[in-house]
Amino acid sequence: MNPARCRILAVGKVRRGWIQDGIDLYLKRLPGLTISELRDSNPDKEADAIRAALRPDETLIALMEQGDTLASVPFAQRLEQFGNQRLAFVIGGADGLTAELKAQAQWRLSLSPMTFPHELARLMLVEQLFRAQAIVQGSPYHRA
C-alpha cells in the first residue's frame, strides 16, 4: 500500500481536538496521505462537491455502514490488490452518502456495523491505513 497514492475526501470539519491530534499522529506516519475537507451541506450538494473533487484516475472507495466489513489483515490484502491505482476514500457527512454516490463507488467499505461520528471514522480510517501499511511491511505495529 502506497499512502502517496491514497487520499481521504471527508465532508465536514473535525471539531474535537483529541480526534485531530490522533489524525495528525497517523498522517505524520503516512507521508503523502492527504485529507481534503469538503463543506457540509445537504447530501445532494455534498455529493456534487465529492464528484467535483474526485480525480478521473481515482478509484472511489465509499465508507458506509452497509459496506464490506473486513478485519485488518484482509483489509491490507485488499488494498494491495489495487496495486498502483490512486485511491480516494470518501467519508460523507452526518446524513451519509447519496445512493448515486454509493452506486458509483468501486468499493463500499464499512469500518464497523456500528455507526460513528464522521470525524471519528476519519481517525479510525487513518489508523487502519497505517496498520495496513505495517502489515504489508511486516512491522511489529500489528500484533494479531
UniProtKB/Swiss-Prot annotation:
Organism superkingdom: Bacteria
InterPro entries (alphabetical): Alpha/beta_knot_MTases (IPR029028), RlmH-like (IPR003742), tRNA_m1G_MTases_N (IPR029026)
GO cellular component: cytoplasm
UniProt-listed Enzyme Commission number(s): 2.1.1.177
Keywords (A to Z) from UniProt: Cytoplasm, Methyltransferase, rRNA processing, S-adenosyl-L-methionine, Transferase
Binding of S-adenosyl-L-methionine, residues: 63, 92, 111-116
Entry GO MF terms: rRNA (pseudouridine-N3-)-methyltransferase activity
Catalytic reaction annotation: pseudouridine(1915) in 23S rRNA + S-adenosyl-L-methionine = N(3)-methylpseudouridine(1915) in 23S rRNA + S-adenosyl-L-homocysteine + H(+)
Location in the cell: Cytoplasm
Pfam families according to UniProt: SPOUT_MTase (PF02590)
Classification via PANTHER family: METHYLTRANSFERASE, RIBOSOMAL RNA LARGE SUBUNIT METHYLTRANSFERASE H
Function: Specifically methylates the pseudouridine at position 1915 (m3Psi1915) in 23S rRNA.
HAMAP family: 23SrRNA_methyltr_H
Similarity section: Belongs to the RNA methyltransferase RlmH family.
Subunit structure: Homodimer.
Name of the protein this chain belongs to: Ribosomal RNA large subunit methyltransferase H
Organism per entry: Synechococcus sp. (strain CC9605)
Gene name as annotated: rlmH
